[in-house]
């Protein structure tokens, strides 16, 4: 696919970065704000960043910089809600049904709401059946060792000195050969904010662009991983979406992974960055690259208007469960708009309560019903939303597993998830990975990758 104003060849094919010695495929000075492809610290054509804005991304709005969406009071800040344990698999191709052994958490209370109203077809005492139709067992218990809340594997370095780090990187790339270990040691132990400061310090000290220097010294997967780490988080999501729709074909699973898992504020920031950086409307690009009910679901996700209150209305959960049953299993055909409306607007704690009510009412879990009623990428998108309501770390753990399972490695997915979750919930993702697959994430990465690329991934993930 070709777009006006872009270089004739568009973005290069995967891994998505230009070979050493070639001009960057990111916007040039005459096209977009960033001549090197990455935003300078507070520079470029973006408007001045407000106090407290994203570092190195002048023009990205500060957290909370957007007005609260109409009709959904109580939206949280960009950190988003905590993970909600207890999910189902995603990595298999669309069409698979069942739970694939995802763990169930201990009981959680989300507060508020009247007692649940008995529903015809429910179970005595509100108990779930010991087995679902087809012999599927309920989720096993979540291990007591599971770290509560969310935690990244990368934390801001104490006694941080951007100029000292810039000097280390300069020495690592100076002369014959490259000291990749020095690069690994620096970038894997600095937060994204600190990396933006290093990038700015490098240009101030040496009058050179750090990203261009890194491109000239690195190649392949190592280059892609390093460049991803130096992109501001919002920009990386926007860039990944652009790449997923650039050229022939569309990488639908990338669209699902980003748009169906981010918080309202993150989505709004992505939409704004996409417009500023690429001069394009994200919603229009999605409409031109997708169709049908999948298109409608992604357009709904682009609005960033999900209710983010943590309280649960149990009466609403019962009513939504009935509506979903009547829109799917309880009728001939499927009312897709009903599924879209509920899954696109309800908070994740509310959806979790709805799934529990649905299981009691229908003697079938909602994920299985979605598999029976939908197919293709709209099925994957709807299931991703439900999986995040149940267990967000488990969703990403399975995505990582399938990126390395079998012949070959989907390095793009591996890099994207490790980088984007490294400061959010990679600790919990690692714990779920071990429980689900009886091996550690680092063990699987070590057996599926090699060289400095492996060293850097393992340094980010940890043991």
UniProtKB/Swiss-Prot annotation:
The keyword Repeat applies. The modification N6-acetyllysine is found at residue 208. Residues 86-99 have a biased composition (Gly residues). It comes from the Eukaryota. Gene3D superfamilies: Annexin (1.10.220.10). Residues 1-34, 77-149 are annotated as: Disordered. Residues 1-18 have a biased composition (Pro residues). A pair of annexin repeats may form one binding site for calcium and phospholipid. Interacts with PDCD6. This is Annexin A7. The gene is Anxa7.
């Amino acid at each position: 696919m070709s777009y006006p104003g872009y270089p004739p060849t568009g973005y290069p094919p995967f891994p998505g970065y230009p070979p050493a010695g070639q001009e960057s495929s990111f916007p040039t000075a005459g096209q977009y704000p960033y001549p090197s492809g990455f935003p300078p610290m507070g520079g470029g054509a973006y408007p001045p960043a407000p106090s407290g804005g994203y570092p190195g991304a002048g023009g990205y709005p500060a957290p909370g910089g957007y007005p609260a969406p109409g009709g959904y009071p109580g939206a949280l800040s960009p950190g988003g809600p905590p993970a909600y344990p207890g999910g189902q698999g995603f990595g298999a191709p669309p069409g698979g049904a069942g739970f694939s052994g995802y763990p169930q958490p201990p009981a959680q209370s989300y507060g508020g709401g009247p007692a649940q109203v008995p529903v015809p077809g429910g179970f005595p005492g509100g108990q779930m059946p010991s087995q679902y139709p087809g012999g599927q067992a309920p989720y096993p218990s979540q291990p007591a060792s599971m770290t509560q809340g969310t935690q990244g594997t990368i934390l801001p370095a104490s006694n941080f000195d951007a100029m000292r780090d810039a000097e280390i990187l300069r020495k690592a790339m100076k002369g014959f050969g490259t000291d990749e270990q020095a690069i690994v040691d620096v970038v894997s132990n600095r937060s994204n904010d600190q990396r933006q400061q290093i990038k700015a310090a490098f240009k101030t000290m040496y009058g050179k662009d750090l990203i261009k220097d890194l491109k000239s010294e690195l190649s392949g997967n190592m280059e892609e991983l390093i460049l991803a780490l130096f992109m501001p988080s919002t920009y990386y999501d926007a860039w990944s979406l652009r790449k997923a729709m650039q050229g022939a074909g569309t990488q639908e699973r990338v669209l699902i992974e980003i748009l169906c898992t981010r918080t309202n504020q993150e989505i709004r920031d992505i939409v704004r960055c996409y417009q500023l950086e690429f001069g394009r409307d994200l919603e229009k690009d999605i409409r031109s690259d997708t169709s049908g009910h999948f298109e409608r679901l992604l357009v709904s996700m682009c609005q960033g208007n999900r209710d983010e209150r943590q309280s649960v209305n149990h009466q609403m959960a019962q009513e939504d469960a009935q509506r979903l049953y009547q829109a799917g299993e309880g009728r001939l055909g499927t009312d897709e708009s009903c599924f879209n409306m509920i899954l696109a607007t309800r908070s994740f704690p509310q959806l979790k309560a709805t799934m529990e009510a649905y299981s009691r009412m229908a003697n079938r879990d909602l994920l299985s019903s979605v598999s029976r009623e939908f197919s293709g990428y709209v099925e994957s998108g709807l299931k991703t939303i439900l999986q995040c309501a149940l267990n967000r770390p488990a969703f990403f753990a399975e995505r990582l597993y399938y990126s390395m399972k079998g012949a070959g490695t989907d390095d793009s997915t591996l890099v994207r998830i490790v980088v984007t979750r490294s400061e959010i919930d990679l600790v919990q993702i690692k714990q779920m990975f071990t429980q689900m697959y009886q091996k550690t994430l680092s063990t699987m990465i070590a057996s599926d990758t090699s060289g400095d690329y492996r060293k850097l991934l393992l340094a980010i993930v940890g043991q």
